[in-house]
Amino acid sequence: MKIAVVTDSSANLSPQAAADYKITVVNDPIMFGNHVYHENEDITTDQFYRLLKVEKDIPTISQISMAEMQVVFDQLKAAGYDQVLVVGLSSGISGWVNNLKTYAPSVKGLDVQVFDSRTACAGTANMVKLAAAMALAGYAIEDIMTQLTRLRAATTTVLIVNSMRHLVKNGRIYNNSSLAGTMVLRNKPIITFNEHGKIQVLGKERTLKNAQQAVQESFSRFVITSQLPVRLDVISANDDAIAEDWASELRYQFPAVRVKTGAIGPLMGVLTGDHALGMIWSLDWKPLLTALNQERQR
């Protein structure tokens, strides 16, 4: 079976990574008022954050339509694929994944499977790259789904935001609704994705430094208890320099961990607002794949 791997643009895959792993990327829509923009198509990450500063209204997220997905499926079928594995951003953020699960059985000539990453940004990207690498190596789609479930269970996403306004406006807070209104000013809210992929508040700190320290302590506990190689992605919303500085500190403190940096793109930026900072840690998918390949050859 020839398997195509599809994801949405909120994973922030580089064009090179998408090409190397033969991943099809579908661009997410966002809305400023009545104007719809698509990530990477008619708005870049830099343009989004510039627009965020000048627009009066808070933007909202939208979702990829099934008509758009059908075009993608038709193209993949014409390219000779038998199966499609869609690895998408959390269903706690967008209804896209659940709509796809409902729509998939109606796609003719393709076996379409859908996997909910229950996260976003680099967290989704790591799962997508594992899926694509396994597909290229000839693994069955059932085996890929098993390993994605394993990686998802070992993935934690924690974000430090300046304000809860964007999350409240978009209705994306799962818990602590009474707390959200008190955290708009003077504090640094810390949020995460829970086991169901919904965004919830972990707590708050008075300063960014204190918030970073709190997040770092959680990461340190994961590293200490993990018996397998760990990957860490430091992500930011229009604060590359701060993210790079933090990543450098973390590389020094955790030399065995593979540390990368990345952006919070427009779709997730709609929810976090400007100057958010985060860490996504998980098992490192590359050593996982190496171990699978070695076991397969025995």
Task: Map each language-model feature to its residues.
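Short beta-strand segments
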Residues: V6-T7, V86-S90, D116, S282
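N-terminal glycine-rich anion-binding loop in soluble enzyme alpha/beta folds
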Residues: A4-Q63
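Mixed-charge interfacial surface used for oligomerization/domain docking
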Residues: S10, S14-T24, P29, L100-A104, ...
